[in-house]
A protein has these predicted regions:
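Boundary/junction segments of secreted and surface-exposed precursor proteins
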Residues: 1-4, 237
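Trp-centered recognition loops
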Residues: 85-88, 93, 174-202
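Carbohydrate-binding surfaces in secreted/extracellular proteins
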Residues: 1-2, 92, 190-224
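Residue-level detector of short, conserved catalytic/binding motifs and their immediate flanks
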Residues: 88-90, 112, 134, 199-201, ...
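Ligand-recognition surfaces built from glycine- and aromatic
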Residues: 226-258
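Extracellular glycan-recognition surfaces and repeat-rich motifs
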Residues: 3-58, 63-64
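Secretory/extracellular carbohydrate-interaction modules
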Residues: 55-173
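Solvent-exposed loop and beta-edge segments used for protein-protein assembly and interaction
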Residues: 51-53, 83-88, 106-108, 193-197, ...
């Protein structure tokens, strides 16, 4: 309900060439609005906002620049000066907004991302070759060849998107029967995808088991520690948003996550 921006670290990454004149514009092509009144977009109070406040953190990416400098990018938010280990979890109410009807419109596919065991010093998103910790991602309208992502960084800092079998994940596309059941139509505009609705999201580490939970259903679970890859099992949590594509949404103001 209040502006807590001073308590967060914000980092961004882009696939633009660092030597390109448009690099700085691409790297800064995001917005993070703390204490945003999302009722102005017709969104009801989040189910876990005890005081029924309609304020939250709104994030958008790759929507500010209409020039050829528009590039795929991601942005991460980390709580400042926080470190966790052992059994812990990050839980949020998430609303992914997208332009267009069921299945989305022009440039609608963007992913909300969330993770743990991060250093808070590196950006985690799909096109970043290095990073740390673990994180997951989901789009709002099933518009990608991979709607549900799982990422992991090894002890050398190399980031890999994990296939569902290694991630312990149900599947990667919104057409999977479990996602179709979890996010049914017409309650959800795009069946199998969580967009344009409040969805509870939890990423937890419990007795060396890493789990991703949405609306109470475990959709990914695997050992938190991985001796082969040397995955981190302590650190801070991360919330974020990423656009895997250079295209701009139209209308661009409809694409964001709260």
């Amino acid at each position: 309900n209040t502006d807590t921006s001073a308590n967060w670290i914000v980092l961004s990454g882009t696939n633009a060439d660092e030597n390109d004149d448009a690099y700085d514009a691409a790297l800064g092509d995001f917005t993070v609005d703390f204490a945003f009144d999302y009722s102005t977009r017709g969104i009801p109070p989040a189910p876990n906002s005890g005081d029924k406040s309609t304020r939250g953190v709104r994030i958008s990416v790759n929507n500010n620049d209409d020039t050829t400098g528009s590039e795929a990018m991601g942005v991460n938010l980390f709580p400042a000066k926080q470190n966790f280990s052992g059994n812990y979890a990050v839980r949020v109410d998430m609303w992914i907004n997208y332009n267009g009807p069921a299945g989305g419109g022009t440039g609608s596919t963007e992913h909300a991302i969330f993770g743990m065991n991060q250093s808070g010093e590196q950006v985690g998103w799909s096109s970043q070759p290095t990073g740390d910790g673990v994180w997951f991602g989901v789009d709002g309208e099933g518009g990608s060849s991979t709607d549900y992502y799982s990422f992991e960084a090894d002890d050398s800092g190399t980031v890999s998107p994990l296939p569902p079998d290694l991630a312990g994940m149900v599947g990667k596309n919104n057409t999977h029967p479990v996602y179709q059941f979890l996010f049914p139509s017409p309650a959800f505009e795009t069946q199998g995808a969580p967009g344009k609705n409040w969805v509870s999201v939890e990423v937890r580490q419990d007795d060396d088991v890493l789990s991703w939970v949405m609306n109470g259903m475990v959709i990914a679970s695997r050992p938190a520690s991985d001796e082969f890859f040397g995955v981190r099992t302590e650190g801070t949590v991360m919330l974020g948003y990423m656009d895997l594509f250079n295209s701009i949404a139209n209308p661009k103001e409809d694409n964001f996550v709260v």
